[in-house]
């Protein structure tokens, strides 16, 4: 097997250390929906204090492996915005574009243990049979050239306990698919990269939007596959917050041209994000500094106040 190039964190201390992360893609600037996710993950990390009196760590990962979708200058702009909003990260920001050899090593080990295979099925072919991949290529022994790589899905994990949404049950048929971990265009699939980097960064908690509930099931399966084969790891706890949507039912996203948040006047958006997250007992913070708002929010953060909903209309 290949030696894995894993950039692991420092040796664990005796007391548990919370390690959360925010992982934006540089396909555009941060919008209000992005701020909600970043703020929730930041507060959940910083409100945690272990037996040694240490706050949780909050890490940044720039998911820049899909180069065709990357907007020039967006990575730097994202970091600038986070700082303007008082969301200061720990350690060095990780760029997925630097992790290629690590991903290749994981793919190589999966192949050696016959836990993956090449597939030439197209999206239209899969859609024609109901939209769920049926493992058609699992025993075909295709070569890598021009084909995607799929994981041999031995577990099909489809339910989990969420930090905010309680018990979540995902689409069982979808969770049992042999899902793609390396695309036919040569790009590493999101599921592979995100799990690999959560392992490398020692992530213990993942807080993000409810649009990623279904992918969580696949990531749980990949964690278990790796842990039971060649890469011992601890699966993070997951928490999913509601999505911010418009009156037309559209999610605030870069694809839907959501407007960027204003670095020059962060306070109103910060307060609006706290209200969105259910942190209702907010004093008059309009005239407070960004640092004062953030410190207040850390001190008063309560997970159980986050709405148990998939989406919330903000109009």
Swiss-Prot record:
Highest taxon in the source lineage: Bacteria
GO molecular function: ATP binding; glutamate-tRNA ligase activity; zinc ion binding
Cofactor(s) needed: Zn(2+)
Keyword vocabulary terms for this entry: Aminoacyl-tRNA synthetase, ATP-binding, Ligase, Metal-binding, Nucleotide-binding, Zinc
Keyword Amino-acid biosynthesis recorded: no
Protein name (Swiss-Prot/TrEMBL): Glutamyl-Q tRNA(Asp) synthetase
Binding locations of Zn(2+): 119, 121, 133, 137
KW Ion transport (keyword) present: no
Binding-site list for ATP: 254
Record Pfam families: tRNA-synt_1c
Biological function: Catalyzes the tRNA-independent activation of glutamate in presence of ATP and the subsequent transfer of glutamate onto a tRNA(Asp). Glutamate is transferred on the 2-amino-5-(4,5-dihydroxy-2-cyclopenten-1-yl) moiety of the queuosine in the wobble position of the QUC anticodon.
Note accompanying the cofactor annotation: Binds 1 zinc ion per subunit.
GO annotation (BP), single: glutamyl-tRNA aminoacylation
GO cellular component terms, semicolon-separated: cytosol
Chain positions of motif 'HIGH' region: 24-34
EC number: 6.1.1.-
Protein family membership: Belongs to the class-I aminoacyl-tRNA synthetase family. GluQ subfamily.
């Amino acid at each position: 097997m290949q030696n894995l190039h894993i950039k692991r964190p420092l040796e664990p201390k005796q007391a548990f250390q919370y390690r959360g992360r925010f992982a934006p893609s540089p396909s555009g600037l941060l919008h209000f929906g992005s701020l909600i996710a970043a703020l929730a993950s930041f507060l959940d990390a910083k409100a945690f204090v272990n037996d040694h009196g240490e706050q949780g760590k909050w890490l940044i990962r720039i998911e820049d492996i899909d180069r065709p979708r990357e907007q020039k200058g967006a990575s730097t702009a994202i970091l600038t915005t986070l700082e303007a909003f008082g969301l200061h990260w720990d350690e060095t920001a990780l760029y997925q574009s630097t992790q290629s050899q690590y991903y290749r090593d994981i793919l190589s080990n999966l192949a050696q243990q016959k836990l993956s295979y090449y597939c030439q099925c197209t999206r239209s072919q899969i859609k024609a049979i109901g939209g769920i991949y049926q493992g058609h290529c699992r025993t075909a022994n295709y070569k890598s050239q021009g084909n995607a790589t799929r994981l041999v899905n031995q577990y099909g994990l489809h339910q989990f306990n969420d930090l905010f949404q309680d018990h979540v049950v995902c689409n069982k048929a979808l969770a049992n698919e042999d899902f793609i971990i390396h695309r036919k265009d040569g790009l590493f699939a999101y599921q592979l990269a995100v799990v690999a980097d959560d392992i490398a960064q020692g992530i213990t908690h993942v807080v993000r939007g409810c649009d990623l509930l279904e992918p969580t099931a696949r990531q749980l399966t990949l964690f278990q596959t790796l842990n039971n084969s060649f890469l011992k790891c601890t699966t993070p706890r997951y928490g999913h917050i509601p999505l911010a949507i418009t009156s037309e039912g559209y999610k605030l996203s870069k694809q839907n041209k959501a407007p960027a948040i204003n670095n020059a006047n962060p306070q109103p958006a910060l307060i609006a994000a706290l209200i969105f997250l259910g942190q209702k007992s907010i004093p008059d913070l309009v005239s407070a500094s960004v640092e004062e708002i953030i410190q207040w929010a850390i001190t008063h953060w309560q997970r159980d106040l986050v709405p148990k909903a998939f989406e919330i209309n903000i109009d």
